[in-house]
Amino acid sequence: MSLERVGFYADCVEQIRLEGILEMPEGVQRPPACILCHPHPIGGGSMYVPLLETMAQVLVSHGWACLRFNFRGVGLSSGVPTGGLCEVEDVGGAYRFLLERQDIDGEDLAVAGWSFGAWIGLRWAVKGSQTRRIALVSPPMVGFDFFYFLDSSDAVLPGDTLIVSGARDQFNDLAKLQELSSRLGADLRVLEGADHFLFGHEREIAEIVASHWQ
């Protein structure tokens, strides 16, 4: 595995430069790639949270390239956090960055987000058919509206959606989660004994995502 610290700009008029880490598998020519979106910065979310680090390690071992990055205003990324108002543009910048690289298969780009990152990632994904696959980990059904953008006339649903949530998730509403899964035609996995923060379940979740995308 190779690791490269990278920088790119958010997909917006402002010059917001984002920091990221691109991890590449060894011996794979133009691998598919996954954009990893971190939880809310108010709760300490960044590209360095253990779950995203583990997901990157496992996905790379399965032949994927992985781009972790910090949303605007987090770490060395410029700008200020907007609570979700503009972070979708950050995912767009990550997508464009990967699309322009010659060593990555731009026809097979996926998104995986945890908590706040799941909300941002899905909002970006339904804006167009740019990604065929998305994984939503612990989508916070309480406090975040996952449905208003699905009802938009120009919404395009990803062809392959995986949802992973803990049975004891403090920010979950099971009825809403099941409705979201149904609307997206998703494969829903509920982990017994796991809460929203998924401590101790990092590798299990990473393997679920990697196996689903095999």
Where would I find each of the regions flagged by the language model?
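Catalytic histidine-centered segment of alpha/beta-hydrolase-like enzymes
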Residues: 194-206
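Active-site nucleophile loop of the alpha/beta-hydrolase fold
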Residues: 39-40, 136-144, 166
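Serine-hydrolase catalytic machinery in alpha/beta-hydrolase-like enzymes
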Residues: 16-26, 30-104
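Gly/Ala-rich beta-loop-alpha elbow adjacent to hydrolase catalytic centers
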Residues: 113-121
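Catalytic histidine neighborhood in serine/cysteine hydrolases
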Residues: 182-197
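Acidic catalytic loop of the alpha/beta-hydrolase fold
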Residues: 143, 167-172, 196-197
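Short beta-strand immediately N-terminal to the catalytic nucleophile in serine-hydrolase-like folds
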Residues: 110-113, 137
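Short beta-strand/loop motif that positions the catalytic acidic residue
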Residues: 156-158, 162-165, 169
